[in-house]
Amino acid sequence: MKIDLNADLGEGCTSDAELLTLVSSANIACGFHAGDAQTMQACVREAIKNGVAIGAHPSFPDRKNFGRSAMQLPPETVYAQTLYQIGALATITRAQGGVMRHVKPHGMLYNQAAKEAQLADAIARAVYACDPALVLVGLAGSELIRAGKQYGLTTREEVFADRGYQADGSLVPRSQSGALIEDEEQALAQTLEMVQHGRVKSITGEWATVTAQTVCLHGDGEHALAFARRLRSAFAEKGIVVAA
């Protein structure tokens, strides 16, 4: 069994360099919610050095709230903004001799595209226009995954180690209780259940079916790094290979 392990980088966290030794894919902020040309260049350089797959992490234009504010933008605006961000990272990557492999939206853009078909279509269309060979990463079972498939893109369905799930397989909103899993044992058990058995227990107790093709690691600091190492160790014990 194989699983991709991804992390969102270039967002001002101090643990990026160490995380790049533990993950197989990096989602690099493209300036709309965090990061700038210099951080993008530095993250790409480190990812290439560690053999980590490079991906764009486009967002709504929302640096004030770290891309976590809901926005109702016209699909054509989202298309143009997504195209812009992907293009910037692709060029920076190419200039350093690398190849960009995937795209994963950030924050509220990701969450809204999971449920809003028009928004999902705009993102998938932008990815396809940039490069039909790019992989589109989205929440397992979401509208974004469906849109990607409609454009003939390779999709990668994502699950979260440290997020609570609702009965329909969607994430518990960050504004609600149960959105974040603080207990390391619970997060580890949830991740293994999703990867090995394709299901997750919701905060209301029901089992939801999920397809786990990539696992997202969140957080900064030693706690996040320690959990990443523990997860890698657990995967190794179960014979699960970490690879993009």
From Swiss-Prot:
Sorted UniProt keywords: ATP-binding, Hydrolase, Nucleotide-binding
Pfam families (alphabetical): LamB_YcsF (PF03746)
EC number(s) per entry: 3.5.2.9
Record has Hydrolase as a keyword: yes
A molecular-function term among this protein's GO annotations: ATP binding
EC top class, as a word: hydrolase
Gene3D superfamilies: Glycoside hydrolase/deacetylase
One of the GO BP terms on file: carbohydrate metabolic process
Reactions performed catalytically: 5-oxo-L-proline + ATP + 2 H2O = L-glutamate + ADP + phosphate + H(+)
Database matches in PANTHER family: 5-OXOPROLINASE SUBUNIT A (PTHR30292:SF0), UNCHARACTERIZED PROTEIN YBGL-RELATED (PTHR30292)
Known function: Catalyzes the cleavage of 5-oxoproline to form L-glutamate coupled to the hydrolysis of ATP to ADP and inorganic phosphate.
Assembly and interaction partners: Forms a complex composed of PxpA, PxpB and PxpC.
Similarity remark: Belongs to the LamB/PxpA family.
Protein name: 5-oxoprolinase subunit A
Gene name in the database record: pxpA
